[in-house]
């Protein structure tokens, strides 16, 4: 039978529950325990797929096509385990299921209520993860902050869960904040006390407290928290601000988090093997070289909108002993100031995904600039579509070439709606989503980078390269290096006479791991390092 660890958060939002859950998952896995992680999100959206990136950040896509919270990206990267639609549940999905069952007559005339019907559905989703993934330990992160009205059904469900499965099979970990009042030079425990009091009023006594702090917690502060919160002092875990998220597992291991959790769950406290992770962190902090990569996007005001892109770049840097500095550039700013003012001194450029026409001209101008100057370039999803628009307008002679998404009246829709999307009415969950195969053409940059003839990548799009223009693009020097196995969909394009210019319709960033960087990002950083070693960027005019 699986054991369960419930991770809640208090005092403030964005306190780091997801990183704590992912780090604990890594620590348990390093002890040869299998782990699955579930994120419970208290918003009423069925999933985050239609939410603004400014409100939610990145939408992380799993192999099975689920549009999920960005924390699932942390879970995958830290535990090196694929998540699925089982691993993210929202209030909206819970209520949708409950209402469907009520309409079907499953409740046999009962008055449908939060308790027991909603809480039973929540508990069933938790059990389903254990049943279908069969891990030793299920970690459950409860989104939101203790005290939020939206989180109450989830907290009630996890309170009941210990009674359902037995006290020895459940541990409660509460992540809280111990702020430093700099004017007084004191660390204050009162916010933690009140947060635990709120949690206890619901009926949950935390077993472990993970205390976020700027400075080390003195023993006296730990003892005070222990006294007021009724938690053993050894279970008051210091989580001091770390230089990077990849330091956090090592910080929590030093504090004994995994050991305490295993004791509570009556599991063997096996010796961890963190040698690979320690080497990774050492490389992160002591790079031998540096590169600067520009990310030119629509949502750079909230960098979490491109979280997996940023992490994939860092992963590639780690493998090459190179530090990667990110320069965040709004594509709208490119429209205002021009690419020369913003990109002249970068070592490489990524144009990531997005939706809608805002900022598109800036993305296209960016791609033309890097194409003509030989700056290493990687386009992702919308980034590939903008590369196609640039080539159509500026090389292939297609005046006013555009995407049907941005200009339905364009005379040259080089990017068109997927045929299966033409009758779609709803936005949510209707994109081409999840893992699909891609056939790599031999003797191409993609073939060199992947080293395989068939690869599998995650998708999230509604528009695709228009095959009516495929011959024209090939004749004008474009190389289509990746296609769907039936040759219907263009998946990868590249320019062979450019030092490094490749773009994909899929999202390779979702499959990158710290210990296994994605080949396309690895290729970009390698090219950026080569570019940096040159006295100046190669000047190319109208090249591929």
Curated annotation (Swiss-Prot):
Binding site for ATP: 14-19, 71
One GO cellular component term: cytosol
Activity regulation comment: Allosterically activated by GTP, when glutamine is the substrate; GTP has no effect on the reaction when ammonia is the substrate. The allosteric effector GTP functions by stabilizing the protein conformation that binds the tetrahedral intermediate(s) formed during glutamine hydrolysis. Inhibited by the product CTP, via allosteric rather than competitive inhibition.
Region spans: Amidoligase domain: 1-267
Keywords: ATP-binding, Glutamine amidotransferase, Ligase, Magnesium, Metal-binding, Nucleotide-binding, Pyrimidine biosynthesis
Binding of Mg(2+), residues: 71, 141
Residues that coordinate or bind L-glutamine: 54, 354, 382-385, 405, 462
Enzyme class, first EC level, given as a word: ligase
Keyword Nucleotide-binding belongs to the record: yes
NCBIfam families the record matches: PRK05380.1, PyrG
Protein name: CTP synthase
Species name: Synechococcus sp. (strain JA-3-3Ab) (Cyanobacteria bacterium Yellowstone A-Prime)
